[in-house]
Every structure is written in structure tokens, then in C-alpha cells.
């Protein structure tokens, strides 16, 4: 007998916004039941910043949902370990390039793990694919899509590719008419881009048909993606800032070299602004993932990033992170009350997950995630469950509250939130605050817990929190509008 699950029909209902066509379209993989996904990864010369975190978490969320639907996902995310910035940073530090890149690769993996991201199935490094890059360049040159300059560089001739600009919706003639780009002596067109760079003193270099040199950035991804996933694959992703010129150039190179469509779907993660401004070191608003996680719990950061649709522009600020923390705490508090009433710890298994997706909230969750991975709407489903849990707990309908809590935790598993033991999460908030005195974030979290305790008639716990805050010099003032606080 064939077993069916609530997600059996959902696989065929997934729609993804394709940056190339500019519209949502039904997802139909090249091979039934399998997905090949390539995401442009990091150039490893520094610690990852909060923008990188959004790309990591956004595609981790997408991969998890595809897997939840039943797809066998081959997720490939590259590492650029040879680049002008890497060379410059190594020289500045007086550090070997290999040591520098490995140090930041290790740091990147630590950051991704802290944010709850799964490792990709493959993580190709550019320096391991030099042969494949050279082969692709040779094909482009032999087919008149590329040419060698007198200086030893090899360039891609953008005029040779009729569809150049189709991803970014740019017309080459218009670009040239409005261009102020100074034409390099060896370039035939100011928008021609380098495929192979002639060797410079004290830089890494490899033997090639055009002399000693190293690859350009764009050819790296074309060679690695097609080697790992084939000439055509299902999804290509990255940050919105890569759409032009990087992804545009990848299409031009790959489709000219193979004669095949490059990627079936293009996904781009939106920008992160900081306090309403573009993040940049010159503005002093540049934050690494480690900067942020020194102040906020990693799960809070993940929750913040998932609370907006992956394509939307997000404003990063302390107030936004505080709000995310308080919202996440409310979900954990709902679970805590139920566990206390039931006298058991919630444990999610496959049966519970199937039951959760069969429920009305589960169907709403599926609908949200199948609508271009809309994690924001999916999270609103979780809050609806939390409200129902609190209502049931308040009237001591313990069995209903327990069933709803099982649904909440099971659905949240797909987003990899709410999976810590409840007390571990709440103690982490209080523990961090205790190191330097209670932070505003920790105070707000305790006030939320106190309010929930009062709602559920756990007055002993409510008094404990009031006393704890009083001992820390925090005075509370209760009113019909809620609780406010001030430092004594």
C-alpha cells in the first residue's frame, strides 16, 4: 500500500519568483524529485557580515523547504579563494594567502553553524577548478566569444552574445551610449570583462595557453557550477548585488560555452540596510555576523532574517533585533507554559510533523512556503498557533494546548527555529545579561515571561521575576496598557 503524507501534493504546487522572467512560476525540476541548486558564496578575505548572513539563512530556508517537500537537493555553494581583495589583504597582513583564506573559511563555517544553517552538499573552492576554467575559456576563444589581448589578459566579448543583459534587463546599446567607462587599451568594448588575468609579480599564477596568470571572478562560478551540477541546473542564487554584472556575465559565459540554458530559475536575496542607510565601512555601520551575535542570540538573528520575505529589503537596527528577540521569546514562552502544565517536554518526530501539516495551520504554512518561500507569512501562522495555545492554557484545556504546541514546534522545525529546549533558550537570555548586568533585551524578555505567568495564574513565578528585576535595580509599573520599566 502506498503511504501518502500531507505534503505529497504540495511538491507540485511550489512557485518561485524567477529574476530572469520577472514573475512567479511553477517549479518544475529538470529531473523529477531532484533539485540542483548553486549559490554564489563568499570571497574569503574577511569575516562574514550581516548581508552574508541573510544569504546563508535565506537559501538554508529554501533548501530545508525543498527537502521537506520531498526533493533530493544537491546544494552547491562555492568559495572564492583567489581574488584581488584576497591578494591585497594577505599582502597587508604579511600572511600567506592559503593561511588567510583557510582562517576565514573556518570562521565562515562557524558563523553559518551558529545561525542554524546546514552545510551545502558541496563547497567547491576556485583554486581546485583552474583546469575547468581554462577549458571553458578555450572554448569561448575558439568560438569567437572571447579574445586575448596583447597584455596577456583574455576578455569576453559582450557584443558576441545576443542576449547579454537579459537577466538585469539592461540593453547593451543603451549602456554604451550612456557609458563613462574608460576603455582599456586591450578591450574592444568598455563592457568586455576579463576571463584570464596575466600574471603580476608576487601573485598566485597558473600555466595557461595565454601565459602565466589567474582566472577572473566571473569565470570561476561558471566553471564550478557546470562541473558540479551540469550545463543546466534548476536554481542559481545569490545576493541581489550580484545580479549585475556577476550573474549576467555568468549567463553569457556559460550559455556561449555550452549552447545550453544555464539556470532554470534565478533567486536573489534582498539588500540589508542599517538604520535606513546602505551598510558600508565608510559610514561606520558595517557589522560582521560576529559583531551581531556578540549582542544577540544566534537564533534571534536567524528569526529576524526569516521574519521578512527573502526578496524584500530589510532594515537592520537594534530596535528591529530587539523586536525579533521579544517575538521569538513569546513563542518560546507559549511552549514553556504548556510543558509546565503537561509536565512533559515537547519532542518532535515524523508522525507529529505529518499531523502538523495535516492541520489547518499546517495547510496555511504549506501555502505560505510554497508561495516563493514566504517565511514571513509562515511565521505569522506560528504566532496564530501561539495565541491559540495561550487561550487554551488560560482555561487549563491542557490537552488542546499540548496538541497545538506540538503543531507549533513541528512546523517551526522546517525553519529551524524553536528547536532548543525551552529553558535552554530562556536561560541563555538571562545568562548573557547577567555577565554585564541586565540588558534592555533581557529585561523585556523577563517582562514578557512575567505577563505570561500572570495570564496563566502562575503568580509565584510572576513574583519571582518581579523580585529578580527589583534586585537588579529595575522598577516595574503595571497599567491596563501593559508594563513599563525604568532603572532605579
Swiss-Prot record:
Disulfide pairs?
A: none
Q: How is the cofactor bound?
A: Binds 1 zinc ion per subunit.
Alphabetical list of CDD domains matching this protein: Anticodon_Ia_Cys (cd07963), CysRS_core (cd00672)
Q: What is its main location?
A: cytoplasm
Q: Which positions does the motif 'HIGH' region occupy?
A: 42-52
Q: What is its EC number?
A: 6.1.1.16
Q: Cofactors per UniProt?
A: Zn(2+)
Annotated keywords: Aminoacyl-tRNA synthetase, ATP-binding, Cytoplasm, Ligase, Metal-binding, Nucleotide-binding, Protein biosynthesis, Zinc
The record's annotation in Gene3D superfamilies points to: Cysteine-tRNA ligase, C-terminal anti-codon recognition domain, HUPs
Q: Could you say which enzyme class this protein belongs to?
A: ligase
* Binding-site residues, Zn(2+): 40, 221, 246, 250
Gene Ontology biological-process annotations? cysteinyl-tRNA aminoacylation
Domain of life (superkingdom)? Bacteria
Q: Which GO terms describe its molecular function?
A: ATP binding; cysteine-tRNA ligase activity; zinc ion binding
Q: Name one GO cellular component term.
A: cytosol
Signal sequence segment: none
Describe the reaction catalysed, as an equation: tRNA(Cys) + L-cysteine + ATP = L-cysteinyl-tRNA(Cys) + AMP + diphosphate
**Positions occupied by motif 'KMSKS' region:** 278-282
Q: Which positions in this protein are listed as binding ATP? A: 281
Check the record and name the InterPro entries matching this protein: Cys-tRNA-ligase, Cys-tRNA-synt_Ia_DALR, Cys-tRNA/MSH_ligase, Rossmann-like_a/b/a_fold, tRNA-synt_1_cat_dom, tRNAsynth_Ia_anticodon-bd
Subunit comment for this entry? Answer: Monomer.
Give the record's family classification: Belongs to the class-I aminoacyl-tRNA synthetase family.
Write down the HAMAP family for this protein, in alphabetical order: Cys_tRNA_synth
- Provide the protein name: Cysteine--tRNA ligase
Name of the gene encoding the protein in the UniProt record: cysS
